[in-house]
Amino acid sequence: MVVIRLARGGSKKRPFFNIVATDSRSRRDGRFIERVGFYNPLAAEGEEGLRLAQDRLAYWQGVGAQLSPTVARLVKQGAKAAA
């Protein structure tokens, strides 16, 4: 099953997350199918903290990919900020 979830990057104490479409059996930071965005929880004022490719997100959901709870929250937050 394909899931859309966060893959952690960055360095110690400075997290950065890629939002990726991956097989559910893959490790958290392992192989993924496609990167559909990023989330930077420590973004400074004026920096972009969240970017999502809405078209690719819609495609993956259309073919049956499940969102992780955190990604679902971020998608909702991103839609609210865009409106």
From Swiss-Prot:
Family, similarity comment: Belongs to the bacterial ribosomal protein bS16 family.
Q: Which Pfam families match?
A: Ribosomal_S16
Q: Which residues form a coiled coil?
A: none
Species: Cupriavidus taiwanensis (strain DSM 17343 / BCRC 17206 / CCUG 44338 / CIP 107171 / LMG 19424 / R1)
Q: Which NCBIfam families match?
A: S16 (TIGR00002)
Q: Which domain of life is it from?
A: Bacteria
Task: Give the keywords, sorted.
Answer: Ribonucleoprotein, Ribosomal protein
Q: Per the record, what is one GO cellular component?
A: small ribosomal subunit
Q: Which Gene3D superfamilies match?
A: 3.30.1320.10
The record's listing under InterPro entries reads:
Ribosomal_bS16 (IPR000307), Ribosomal_bS16_dom_sf (IPR023803)
* GO biological process assignments: translation
Q: What is this protein called?
A: Small ribosomal subunit protein bS16
Task: Reply yes or no: does the keyword Protease apply.
Answer: no
Any one GO molecular-function label of the UniProt entry: structural constituent of ribosome
Q: Where are the transmembrane segments?
A: none
* Originating gene: rpsP
